[in-house]
Amino acid sequence: MSKGHSLQDPYLNTLRKERVPVSIYLVNGIKLQGQIESFDQFVILLKNTVSQMVYKTAISTVVPSRPVRLPSGDQPAEPGNA
């Protein structure tokens, strides 16, 4: 795991596993809402009434609907696929 993903992957994986509703703001200002179904190095699959593949390069901010507790650093992160 590269250093840049040491926070991103566990955070997204926690949101996915706990099915936390999120708002994703894109760099062009558009707001998307749903639950993270899956993710990889380049994209997030966001599910609401439809599934949308969102490229991470287009994302500005990910805002969970409730506070999220990250797993402790001594546990390895699981892959982002369901």
Curated annotation (Swiss-Prot):
Key words, A-Z: RNA-binding, Stress response
Classification via Gene3D superfamilies: 2.30.30.100
GO BP, one annotated term: regulation of RNA stability
Pfam family, one: Hfq
Occurrences of domain Sm (ranges): 9-68
Cysteines paired by S-S bonds: none
GO CC annotation terms, alphabetical: cytosol
Domain of life: Bacteria
Single Gene Ontology MF annotation: RNA binding
Keyword RNA-binding found: yes
PROSITE patterns named in the record: SM
Free-text function comment from the UniProt entry: RNA chaperone that binds small regulatory RNA (sRNAs) and mRNAs to facilitate mRNA translational regulation in response to envelope stress, environmental stress and changes in metabolite concentrations. Also binds with high specificity to tRNAs.
Family affiliation: Belongs to the Hfq family.
Self-association state and partner proteins as the record states: Homohexamer.
Protein name stated in the entry: RNA-binding protein Hfq
Organism: Pseudomonas aeruginosa
